């Protein structure tokens, strides 16, 4: 074996190793560029509210209008919107609901309640349950407010669920407290959202987009 042949032979392992490293790097970049699309199903999603007064506790519901989210696990960045039909709110009492829509929510003027998340704090496991905190903008009564809410997320290959509980200090946020002289109502309302839908893996075209 001449000198040139010997040198070329010695370079082969390094070339193979270099190719392996390039493939590994490419796979890491591809994984980090992958995003997950969450579609919310109105039939499987529930929005409940609880409001207390001096006599009893009022329980009611709202309906999901639409919802779609895009999540990047590598960065925790999330985008999209969850939209609730404000006009769908009901508590089982027609008189109370009419007052809620006319005086508190003003749902004819502000027909939607929306949450636009922008960041997830904590890791979301690709399978099973995870406890995270979701940051974003919550819009109610025509005003955006920044909130951070704890969420319990459960992932499966083709579907997902998330349970969120948070408090809306509606009176502090400028909405009317429906209290009367003889019936005092709490200044805040408890919200329980259980969202569910489908999952789809996607690959981002460019991190700059």
Describe the predicted segments one by one.
Residues 31-209:
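Low-complexity, acidic/polar, glycine-enriched regions of mature
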Residues 6, 19-20, 165, 178:
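Intrinsically disordered, low-complexity regulatory segments enriched
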Residues 2-18:
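Bacterial N-terminal signal peptides that target proteins for export
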Residues 15-28:
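Bacterial N-terminal signal peptides
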């Amino acid at each position: 074996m001449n000198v040139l042949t010997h040198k070329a032979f010695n370079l082969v392992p390094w070339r193979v190793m270099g190719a392996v490293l390039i493939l590994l790097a490419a796979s890491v970049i591809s994984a980090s560029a992958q995003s997950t699309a969450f579609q919310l199903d109105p039939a499987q999603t529930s929005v409940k509210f609880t409001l207390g007064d001096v006599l009893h506790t009022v329980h009611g519901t709202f309906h999901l209008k639409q919802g779609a989210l895009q999540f990047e696990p590598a960065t925790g960045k999330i985008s999209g919107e969850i939209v609730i039909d404000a006009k769908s709110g009901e508590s089982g009492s027609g008189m109370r609901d009419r007052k809620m829509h006319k005086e508190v929510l003003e749902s004819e003027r502000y027909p939607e309640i929306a949450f636009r998340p922008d960041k997830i704090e904590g890791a979301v496991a690709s399978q099973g349950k995870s406890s995270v905190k979701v940051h974003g903008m919550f819009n109610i009564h025509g005003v955006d407010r920044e909130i951070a809410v704890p969420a319990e997320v459960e992932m499966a290959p083709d579907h997902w669920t998330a349970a969120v509980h948070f408090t809306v200090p509606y009176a502090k946020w400028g909405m009317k407290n429906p209290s009367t002289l003889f019936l005092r109502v709490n200044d805040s309302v408890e919200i329980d959202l259980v969202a569910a839908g489908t999952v789809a893996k996607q690959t981002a075209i460019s991190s700059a987009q």
